[in-house]
Curated annotation (Swiss-Prot):
Residues 258-336 are annotated as: Head domain (RuvB-H). This is Holliday junction branch migration complex subunit RuvB. Residues 185-255 are annotated as: Small ATPAse domain (RuvB-S). It catalyses: ATP + H2O = ADP + phosphate + H(+). The gene is ruvB. The keyword ATP-binding applies. Residues 4-184 are annotated as: Large ATPase domain (RuvB-L). One of its GO terms (biological process) is DNA repair. The keyword Transferase does not apply. Belongs to the RuvB family. Gene3D superfamilies: 1.10.8.60, P-loop containing nucleotide triphosphate hydrolases (3.40.50.300), Winged helix-like DNA-binding domain superfamily/Winged helix DNA-binding domain (1.10.10.10).
Length: 336
């Protein structure tokens, strides 16, 4: 199954997701959830502004859809500087990165999404830029080649990744601030859904927002995507007002169940239960059983299932928990 086909995928960006930019928080005081990250960043930003320094380099990691790009925008807004945005796969050559770095103004923020996908050549250029605000460039070729150093203005690099373990140690060690974004709690998601509904001009009850939040897998991007589909249902099937009952009907129609699981989540859990007797099962076998790539299972499907206690990752493989068996109304086997 193609990941983009999943309504509750947080790892893909649909064209309509551009509308989310208008409802994204611009400042820390508008930022909902992630209380530890918010309080720490408030201190770090205030301290940097008091000293008149650029904010230290920041690494943000966590599952997709939790607001890494939003946080980068907030940092730039709070610091009162420009934000330059790119991604690891786009920076194919050292010259691509050099061009971006030399165009930065003092204290500007350079945001690199999917930073774990930087090529080794580009990453080498980044080391002196991060550490010494210098760019080492080779001029010429062969025996006549020489290296020149270009001074860069103090800047902040913000790197975002869903796979912090894939970063090389030299790159990871150069970030002075490291923040992990966690799945959102339902009350925070309910607030986000209500706020988005107001921006979209929708009439939505608190219970309606709660119903969407409960099924959003702890992820704001999914919450906003579900809200738009619920809006469509409410406008076509009813008078446009979104109550808890209308939201539940819409989400049931979309095959998003009360736990926020869709077809792929249920397929994975049922494969572990039915085909492998609850596990343990190795990742490669599980990927073959459900027709998915192992990276998709690791990065997209598993994190939420593990965090919610439906799947367990053990040294011997993946295992379905008692909660997973109960979710499908199947009696779990007795422990030996």
């Amino acid at each position: 199954m193609i990941e983009a086909d999943r309504l509750i995928s947080a790892g893909t960006t649909l064209p309509e997701d551009g509308a989310d930019r208008a409802i994204r928080p611009k400042l820390l005081e508008e930022y909902v959830g992630q209380p530890q990250v918010r309080s720490q960043m408030e201190i770090f930003i205030k301290a940097a502004k008091l000293r008149g320094d650029a904010l230290d380099h920041l690494l943000i990691f966590g599952p997709p859809g939790l607001g890494k790009t939003t946080l980068a925008n907030i940092v730039a807004n709070e610091m009162g500087v420009n934000l330059r945005t790119t991604s690891g796969p786009v920076l194919e050559k050292a010259g691509d990165l050099a061009a971006m770095l030399t165009n930065l103004e003092p204290h500007d923020v350079l945001f690199i999404d999917e930073i774990h996908r930087l090529s080794p050549v580009v990453e080498e250029v980044l080391y002196p830029a991060m550490e010494d605000y210098q760019l080492d460039i080779m001029i010429g070729e062969g025996p006549a080649a020489r290296s020149i150093k270009i001074d860069l203005p103090p800047f902040t690099l913000i790197g975002a990744t869903t796979r912090a373990g894939s970063l090389t140690s030299p790159l990871r060690d150069r970030f002075g601030i490291v923040q992990r974004l966690e799945f959102y709690q339902v009350p925070d998601l309910q607030y986000i859904v209500s706020r988005s509904a107001r921006f979209m001009g929708l009439e939505m009850s608190d219970d309606g927002a709660l119903e969407v939040a409960r099924r959003a897998r702890g992820t704001p991007r999914i919450a906003n995507r579900l809200l738009r589909r619920v809006r469509d249902f409410a406008e076509v099937k009813h008078d446009g007002t979104i109550s808890a009952d209308i939201a539940a009907q819409a989400l049931d129609m979309l095959n998003v169940d009360a736990e926020g699981f869709d077809y792929m989540d249920r397929k994975l859990l049922l494969a572990v239960i039915d085909k492998f007797f609850g596990g343990p099962v190795g990742l490669d076998n599980l990927a073959a059983a459900i027709g998915e790539e192992r990276e998709t299972i690791e990065d997209v499907l598993e994190p939420y299932l593990i965090q919610q206690g439906f799947l367990q990752r053990t040294p011997r493989g993946r295992m379905a928990t008692t909660r997973a068996w109960n979710h499908f109304g199947i009696t779990p086997p007795e422990m030996p």
